[in-house]
From Swiss-Prot:
The gene is ANPEP. Broad specificity aminopeptidase which plays a role in the final digestion of peptides generated from hydrolysis of proteins by gastric and pancreatic proteases. Also involved in the processing of various peptides including peptide hormones, such as angiotensin III and IV, neuropeptides, and chemokines. May also be involved the cleavage of peptides bound to major histocompatibility complex class II molecules of antigen presenting cells. May have a role in angiogenesis and promote cholesterol crystallization. Coiled coil: none annotated. This is Aminopeptidase N. It comes from the Eukaryota. It catalyses: Release of an N-terminal amino acid, Xaa-|-Yaa- from a peptide, amide or arylamide. Xaa is preferably Ala, but may be most amino acids including Pro (slow action). When a terminal hydrophobic residue is followed by a prolyl residue, the two may be released as an intact Xaa-Pro dipeptide. It is a single-pass type II membrane protein. Binds 1 zinc ion per subunit. Residues 40-61 are annotated as: Disordered.
């Protein structure tokens, strides 16, 4: 599943200093505003009410000896196949509810004798047949015991069938059910999405099963290791199209009502429940055939398809599929690849096997109004989801504790697949900014977590949802990139192909991948490792955090320590490796590559590679940032690197120019170098025109903005940034012929946005005039937008910030009338840039009205308001006052709470704010925090670190900005 961003996912080019930095995470991890009713849906006369004695007490009071009180399924029964018939009703019933009805037959094998059948079921009402919710029969002569009773256990989401006798080990059985569920607009399970076609409201029935919502669609053994085959048969209105994982086998009229069509799909391969998908809609498609005869189709609203918005996704899908087939040395496993853009969708995208679902913004692209970043998002998200068709779908992790392997791998190779489709963009470099740098801010906390956790620590749906975080996606991608780098890509691919061939249609744990990579290493002699793949990688997978590698060039000593943002924080999570890593250290001396060195799990060692003599000689470590660690140096080497940057920066690779800035600011935050040293590393930017160093600087300085934009430091800081960015602003003004054309390269187009956003937000009058004039031209002629799509996010935001009610109302009207989601998203984020308190308060109220802001966008909009220094207090008051309602409406397992807590607390840096946050935690212990539990602990830790950092650095920072802004 695409993070959507997490999100996002994630370009980091939308003007961090404008106060919308929260969007970088949100795009990746955009989340659902749930309104699923806590009570059960109204029941038809034939439906049994939910068991009035269904378990609902806290898990701690339950008898854990009873298997239906445990969240994990017993291993007594293994599913073989399902036959599922579903009929969604796309207009409300007499109670005003949208519903679906269904029937299911599951065939399963008894592995161990048992007198109980436990199968997942969530918010389904069952037809009583022969006195029970299920009918059980034997297969091939086996005789089932009689049913004693059935019950629904709400807390653990089970349908439990108690038997009068034992099921026999080795025998097969079939169980039939008939049921009804609500086709709710909660973005989970089998749900309803809506859109307008002219003045007509259209309804789509669609699915989102990951991680634990297939059970909301039909009763199933809803764990990833419980693979089976599926026969899916939707019954749908005649004029609608049904889609599923496979191609249709037949489509016939429903005998009793020809206005309905029965579409039966071919049997799926053996697969996990979370990868199922079925959709009923009036969407249309465009189609192509890949060189390997795979049918490729892009589906969306008819108007989007007719206007060509699916063409770019269609163009890149074939090349990306071919790239991965070659990369994995494994053919694409299915006959077709459908991809569909949905108006309402929780995540960025979902890798359902053969039927990938997307937010419209992650699939559709209009060259007339979409920006280059929108285009990059499409190609990278498509690559991410298609990578999963092999790694995750064909071979699946055994349990969610190894989710990092699925999502980290896809988050790494998405850059490779996208780079193949767009070879001139240099997309592979962006993984450093988008993934590695961003996740280190989280992984440097004592409340971080390892990539892989013991399986018994991940049980509930909320615990599973909590794993869909930046550690899983971005750290996973970063350490796999490091592994591929020190193995070489060829060896990595060889081991990967062996892994996929061995475990096709099966489940694995991460150790299985290590074993096959080790076999590839053992088959050759050119690459020699200091230890086994497992011994090296377990230190990166099983312990949280990462090292700071310190190179002392005066004596050649190289050492490592667990990097913590707050070095005084208490690390309570033990490590079998004592927080020491086996670290691959690449380096250069004065621009010349040195041989690779391994820091072999020891705290320090000495080597002449790292000793430097002479006033002008320097060492640079972690070339192209292939290693997942930060680098510190002795003061003399830092000064020499700064001199090199200010005299001839091109000697240092552009990625490492970004690394020097990023690492120094992080080291300063952890009090390992003076904050003035980190600030000195930005002095060369006055002559820098490359995107990556500028983006690293703006991302790092955004922390200073968050800490100081309410204090006297902010004025000198703005003056310094204005001075540094002015040459960049003039550079892009010149090469774009006074902003009338766009730069040639992707990186330059991104840095043009940085130039304008930074210039405007730091008071350069020419920039403010530019954006105000462009916005006024649009207001004067709303049907003719003169603002280039690349520049719209930053122009909209700055014009609204500089303007008042008139500008805001105009943008709101344009948002309400926007027909393309990319344009709507730009306007939605920009509306949070207002400097008027009452306008922001009004906008905040709109987020709870789904007629104004779609539920999928509510949380990200709240976060955008919180990222505005004026809106942050409004949102924090709102969250404190409404936490219980938000928790009930959004759902305890939603991804939204982690993002919401991070966004609203990111400026906290005073004792008063810490006390407020601690009181908030105490006040809501009974309600709970769901998937935001870890984020709350991280927010408390981050706030304490912020308080300490501000106290220790404020005076020095004020003095530095004052001295360097002249």
């Amino acid at each position: 599943m695409a993070k959507g961003f997490y999100i996002s996912k994630s370009l980091g080019i939308l003007g961090i200093l404008l106060g919308v930095a929260a969007l970088c995470t949100i795009v990746a991890l955009s989340v659902v505003y749930r309104q699923e009713k806590n009570k059960n849906t109204s029941q038809s006369p034939s439906m049994a009410p939910l068991n009035p004695t269904a378990t609902s007490s806290p898990a701690t009071t339950l008898d854990q000896n009873l298997p239906w009180n445990r969240y994990r399924l017993p291993k007594t029964l293994i599913p073989d196949s399902y036959n599922v018939v579903l009929r969604p009703y796309l207009s409300p019933n007499s109670q005003g509810l949208y519903i679906f009805t269904g029937s299911s037959t599951v065939r399963f094998t008894c592995q161990e004798a048992t007198n109980v059948i436990i199968i997942h079921s969530k918010k389904l009402n069952y037809t009583i047949t022969q006195g029970h919710r299920v009918v059980l029969r034997g297969v091939r002569g086996s005789q089932p015991p009689a049913i004693a009773s059935t019950e629904l256990v709400e807390l653990t989401e089970y349908l439990v069938v108690h038997l009068q006798g034992q099921l026999v080990a080795g025998s097969q059985y079939e169980m039939d059910t008939q049921f009804q569920g609500e086709l709710a607009d909660d973005l989970a399970g089998f749900y309803r999405s809506e859109y307008m076609e002219g003045n007509v409201r259209k309804v789509v029935a669609t699915t989102q099963m990951q991680a634990a919502d297939a059970r909301k669609s039909f009763p199933c053994f809803d764990e990833p290791a419980m693979k089976a085959t599926f026969n899916i048969t939707p019954i749908h209105p005649r004029d609608y199209t049904a889609l599923s994982n496979m191609l249709p086998r037949s489509s016939t009229a429903l005998p009793e009502d020809p206005n309905w069509t029965v579409t039966e799909f071919h049997t799926t391969p053996k697969m996990s429940t979370y990868l199922l998908a079925y959709i009923v809609s009036e969407f249309t498609n465009i189609e192509a055939q890949s060189p390997n005869n795979v049918q490729i189709r892009i589906w969306a609203r008819p108007s989007a398809i007719s206007e060509g918005h699916g063409q770019y996704a269609l163009n890149v899908t074939g090349p990306i599929l071919n790239f991965f087939a070659n990369h994995y040395n494994t053919p694409y496993p299915l006959e077709k690849s459908d991809q569909i853009g949905l108006p309402d969708f929780n995540a960025g995208a979902m890798e359902n096997w053969g039927l990938v679902t997307y937010r419209e913004s992650a699939l559709l692209f209009d060259p007339l109004v979409s920006s280059i970043s929108n285009k990059e998002r499409v190609v990278t998200v498509v690559a991410h989801e298609l990578a999963h068709q092999w790694f995750g779908n064909l071979v699946t992790v055994d349990w969610w504790n190894d989710l990092w392997l699925n999502e980290g791998f896809a988050s790494y190779v998405e850059y490779l697949g996208a780079d193949y489709a767009e070879p001139t963009w240099n997309l592979k470099d962006l993984i450093v900014l988008n993934e590695l740098h961003s996740v280190m801010a989280v992984d440097a906390l004592a409340s971080s977590h390892p990539l892989s956790s013991p399986a018994d620590e991940v049980n509930t749906p909320a615990q599973i949802s909590e794993l869909f975080d930046s550690i899983t996606y971005s750290k996973g991608a970063s350490v796999l990139r490091m592994l591929s780098s020190f193995l070489t890509e060829d060896l990595f691919k060889e081991g990967l192909a062996s892994y996929l061939h061995t475990f096709a249609y099966q489940n694995t744990i991460y150790l299985d991948l290590w074993e096959h990579l080790q076999q590839a290493v053992n088959s050759q002699s050119a690459i020699q490792l200091p230890a086994s793949v497992r011994d090296i990688m377990d230190r990166w997978i099983l312990q949280m955090g990462f090292p700071v590698v310190t190179v002392n060039t005066t004596n050649g000593i190289i050492s490592q320590h667990h990097f913590l943002l707050d070095p005084t924080s208490n690390v309570t999570r033990p490590s079998d490796f004592n927080y020491l890593w086996i670290v691959p250290v690449s380096s250069m001396r004065n621009g010349v590559l040195e041989q690779e060195f391994w820091l072999e799990g020891v705290e320090q060692t000495q080597n002449s590679l790292f000793r430097v003599e002479g006033d002008n000689n320097w060492i640079l470590a972690n070339l192209n940032v292939t290693g997942y660690y930060q680098v510190n140096y002795d003061e003399g080497n830092w000064k020499k690197l700064q001199t090199q940057l200010q005299t001839n920066p091109s000697v240092i690779p552009v990625i490492n120019r970004a690394q020097i800035i990023h690492d120094a600011f992080n080291l300063a935050s952890a009090q390992k170098v003076p904050v003035t040293l980190a600030l000195d590393n930005t002095l060369f930017l006055i002559r820098e025109t490359e995107y990556m160093p500028w983006q690293a600087a703006l991302s790092s300085l955004n922390y200073f903005k968050l800490m100081f934009d309410r204090s006297e430091v902010y004025g000198p800081m703005k003056n310094y940034l204005s001075k540094q960015v002015r040459p960049l602003f003039e550079h892009f003004k010149n090469i774009t012929n006074d902003w009338t054309r766009r730069p040639d390269t992707l990186m330059d187009q991104y840095n043009e946005i940085n130039a304008i956003s930074t210039a405007c937000s730091n008071g350069i009058q020419e920039c403010e005039t530019l954006v105000s004039d462009l916005f006024k031209q649009w207001m004067d002629d709303p049907s003719n937008n003169p603002i280039h799509p690349n520049l719209r996010t930053t122009v909209y935001c700055n014009a609204i910030a500089l303007g008042g009610e008139r500008e805001w109302d105009f943008a709101w009207e344009q948002f309400r009338n926007a027909t393309l989601v990319n344009e709507a998203d730009k306007l939605r984020s920009a509306l949070a840039c207002s400097n008027e308190v009452w306008i922001l308060n009004r906008y905040l109220s709109y987020t709870l009205n789904p007629d104004y802001i779609r539920r999928q966008d509510a949380t990200s909009t709240i976060n955008s308001i919180a990222s505005n220094v004026i809106g942050q207090t409004l949102v924090w008051d709102f969250v404190q006052s409404n936490w219980k309602k938000l928790f009930e409406d959004f759902g305890g397992g939603s991804f939204s709470f982690a993002n919401l807590i991070r966004a609203v607390t990111r400026r906290f840096s005073t004792e008063y704010e810490l006390q407020q946050l601690e009181q908030f935690r105490l006040n809501n212990l009974d309600t709970g925090f769901g998937s935001g539990t870890r984020a709350l602990e991280q927010a408390l830790e981050q706030t304490r670190a912020n308080i300490k950092w501000v106290q220790e650095n404020k005076e020095a920072v004020l003095a530095w900005f004052t001295a360097n802004s002249a």
